[in-house]
């Protein structure tokens, strides 16, 4: 299996409360962070989609909107909505605020898609990264079951589903732009 046979979905629906503004629209090199991620991953994957609660991008991207079945704002709802759009395949899911994840990290996770796992996510010494990994579309119903029990964290899946945590030593590749200072620092590194 090759990366260019797979689909990628960039999650853009977070509240961005720590950042104080919508992270998906932060500007990097004359484009917003969403466009930055879509451009990068379009060179790697078959198709790149954007997941959000509503179309805040004026039809600029292939959009997967959150399901209206549940009136919550959560990663589990986003994952359920994403996986419901695909049939019998793995989908790479990444949050928009992880701009340093690239092909090297993907290639390290890729071989585990051929094994007996339904979830393959990145893990560093300090964190598991549930919003950086491959999820099998067959998990949509499991996500729905958790939503019906009002369990919103993707981490609940790991205890029920065969999950591979792919170990990475370098925390830097998994930087999350949670605060404005982190965004400013990353922006200055791009120059």
Curated annotation (Swiss-Prot):
<dbReference type="GO" id="GO:0005525">
    <property type="term" value="F:GTP binding"/>
</dbReference>
<comment type="function">
    <text>Transfers a GMP moiety from GTP to Mo-molybdopterin (Mo-MPT) cofactor (Moco or molybdenum cofactor) to form Mo-molybdopterin guanine dinucleotide (Mo-MGD) cofactor.</text>
</comment>
<dbReference type="GO" id="GO:0061603">
    <property type="term" value="F:molybdenum cofactor guanylyltransferase activity"/>
</dbReference>
<keyword id="KW-0342">GTP-binding</keyword>
<keyword id="KW-0501">Molybdenum cofactor biosynthesis</keyword>
<feature type="binding site">
    <location>
        <position position="97"/>
    </location>
    <ligand>
        <name>GTP</name>
    </ligand>
</feature>
<dbReference type="GO" id="GO:0005737">
    <property type="term" value="C:cytoplasm"/>
</dbReference>
<feature type="binding site">
    <location>
        <position position="23"/>
    </location>
    <ligand>
        <name>GTP</name>
    </ligand>
</feature>
<keyword id="KW-0547">Nucleotide-binding</keyword>
<dbReference type="InterPro" id="IPR025877">
    <property type="entry name" value="MobA-like_NTP_Trfase"/>
</dbReference>
<feature type="binding site">
    <location>
        <position position="97"/>
    </location>
    <ligand>
        <name>Mg(2+)</name>
    </ligand>
</feature>
<comment type="subunit">
    <text>Monomer.</text>
</comment>
<keyword id="KW-0460">Magnesium</keyword>
<dbReference type="Pfam" id="PF12804">
    <property type="entry name" value="NTP_transf_3"/>
</dbReference>
<dbReference type="InterPro" id="IPR013482">
    <property type="entry name" value="Molybde_CF_guanTrfase"/>
</dbReference>
<keyword id="KW-0479">Metal-binding</keyword>
<dbReference type="GO" id="GO:1902758">
    <property type="term" value="P:bis(molybdopterin guanine dinucleotide)molybdenum biosynthetic process"/>
</dbReference>
<protein>
    <recommendedName>
        <fullName>Molybdenum cofactor guanylyltransferase</fullName>
        <ecNumber>2.7.7.77</ecNumber>
    </recommendedName>
</protein>
<keyword id="KW-0963">Cytoplasm</keyword>
<comment type="similarity">
    <text>Belongs to the MobA family.</text>
</comment>
<feature type="binding site">
    <location>
        <position position="66"/>
    </location>
    <ligand>
        <name>GTP</name>
    </ligand>
</feature>
<dbReference type="GO" id="GO:0046872">
    <property type="term" value="F:metal ion binding"/>
</dbReference>
<keyword id="KW-0808">Transferase</keyword>
<feature type="binding site">
    <location>
        <begin position="11"/>
        <end position="13"/>
    </location>
    <ligand>
        <name>GTP</name>
    </ligand>
</feature>
<dbReference type="InterPro" id="IPR029044">
    <property type="entry name" value="Nucleotide-diphossugar_trans"/>
</dbReference>
């Amino acid at each position: 299996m090759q990366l260019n046979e797979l689909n990628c979905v960039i999650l853009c629906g977070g509240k961005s409360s720590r950042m104080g503004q919508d992270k998906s629209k932060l500007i990097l090199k004359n484009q917003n962070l969403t466009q930055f991620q879509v451009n990068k991953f379009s060179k790697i994957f078959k198709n790149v989609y954007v997941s959000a609660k509503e179309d805040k991008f004026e039809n600029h991207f292939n959009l997967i909107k959150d399901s209206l079945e549940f009136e919550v704002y959560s990663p589990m709802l986003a994952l359920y909505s994403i996986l419901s759009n695909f049939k019998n395949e793995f989908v790479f899911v990444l949050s928009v605020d992880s701009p340093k994840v690239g092909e090297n990290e993907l290639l390290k996770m890729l071989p585990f898609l051929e094994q007996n796992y339904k979830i393959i996510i990145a893990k560093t010494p300090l964190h598991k990264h549930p919003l950086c990994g491959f999820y099998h579309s067959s998990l949509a119903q499991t996500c729905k079951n958790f939503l019906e029990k009002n369990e919103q964290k993707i981490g609940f899946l790991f205890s029920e589903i065969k999950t591979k945590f792919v170990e990475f030593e370098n925390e830097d590749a998994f930087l999350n732009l949670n605060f404005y200072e982190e965004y400013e620092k990353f922006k200055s590194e791009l120059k």
